[in-house]
């Protein structure tokens, strides 16, 4: 069996795709799988550490950009489609699965044009325009939420939920805390804002930290800041003498989850699925421009 999984740009698209890939590999040892994502995106290095083959497409989003940036993004569409068709001809997959992200639409559309079976997975309750359009022409649509079904042809829809990586389970708190250099008996707050970080969450924590005068003696922190705020946040914890592990991004998220008593994070669909599966108490902050 040969499959292409297309998606990336953010962890919300990539990690459910990885979960599916790992499950397929466990069920089909003969599986030959290729990930396709954004050229130069964070997914390339992350997938390489996991041993997955990857090819990149030049692509960029349109939403929320200035006019010139949008025009530049539009010029990448033809080259992205040509590149996708080239990948398809060389790899000859039995199926193409799209998980969203800038590169996913081009790859899935190429699959449709080449008459390869195609599937898209919609992680959110309110699908974006690209998936709504693709839903009309692909063979199957998998949705995480029942509410999303109304945006697609009923005969194509299957409610699957959001895939969660098996690696997140089975790590003990003691082992995880030791790997992070933290105290397994101390209350641990895990803060993260998705694969790119969340500036407002980082800012809110830094503003609140000085107010925790008594609690700081009993709390330790794990904080994924994103690349932008790394130095600022590290300095904030150091200035107050707070035990904290601060990184731009945690590839070993299983270790962070296993150590955490409480999560303070963005309410991304993939994150919520992981928190529910792990039974982690959480304070969720929705991103105002997503559903």
Identify the residue ranges that each predicted region occupies.
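Acidic donor-binding loop of glycosyltransferase active sites
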Residues: 93-95, 250, 254, 258-271, ...
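Glycosyltransferases and closely related glycan-assembly transferases
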Residues: 83-96, 104-119, 132-140
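Structural loop-to-beta junction motif characteristic of Rossmann-like glycosyltransferase folds
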Residues: 52, 116-117, 261-262, 279-287
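Short alpha-helix at the nucleotide-sugar/activated-sugar donor binding site of glycosyltransferases
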Residues: 112, 135, 257, 275-276, ...
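Short amphipathic alpha-helix
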Residues: 13-25
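Conserved nucleotide-sugar phosphate-binding/catalytic loop shared by glycosyltransferases and other
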Residues: 2-8, 27-76, 227-229
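Donor-nucleotide binding loops and adjacent catalytic segments primarily
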Residues: 36, 41, 46, 50, ...
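Active-site-proximal region of nucleotide-activated glycan assembly enzymes
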Residues: 53, 112-174
């Amino acid at each position: 069996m040969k499959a292409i999984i297309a998606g990336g740009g953010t962890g919300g698209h990539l990690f459910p795709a990885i979960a599916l890939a790992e499950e397929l590999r466990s069920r089909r040892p003969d599986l030959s799988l290729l990930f396709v994502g954004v050229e130069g995106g964070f997914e390339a290095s992350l997938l390489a550490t996991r041993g997955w083959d990857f090819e990149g497409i030049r692509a960029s989003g349109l939403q929320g950009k200035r006019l010139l940036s949008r025009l530049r993004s539009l010029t990448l569409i033809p080259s992205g489609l040509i590149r996708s068709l080239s990948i398809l001809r060389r790899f000859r997959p039995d199926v193409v699965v799209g998980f969203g992200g800038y590169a996913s639409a081009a790859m899935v559309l190429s699959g449709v044009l080449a008459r390869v079976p195609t599937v898209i997975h919609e992680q959110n309750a309110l699908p974006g325009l690209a998936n709504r359009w693709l839903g009309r022409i692909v063979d199957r649509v998998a949705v995480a939420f029942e509410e999303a079904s109304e945006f697609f042809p009923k005969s194509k829809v299957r409610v699957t939920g959001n895939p969660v990586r098996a690696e997140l389970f089975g790590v003990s708190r003691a082992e995880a805390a030791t790997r992070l250099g933290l105290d397994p008996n101390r209350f641990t707050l895990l803060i993260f804002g998705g694969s790119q970080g969340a500036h407002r969450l980082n800012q809110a924590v830094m503003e609140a930290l000085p107010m925790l005068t008594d609690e700081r003696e009993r709390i330790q922190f794990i904080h994924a800041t994103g690349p932008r705020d790394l130095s600022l946040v590290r300095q904030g914890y150091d200035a107050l003498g707070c035990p904290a592990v601060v990184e731009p991004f945690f590839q070993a998220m299983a270790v962070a989850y296993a150590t955490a008593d409480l999560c303070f994070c963005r309410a991304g669909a993939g994150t919520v699925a992981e928190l529910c599966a792990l039974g982690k108490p959480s304070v969720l902050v929705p991103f105002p421009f997503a559903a």
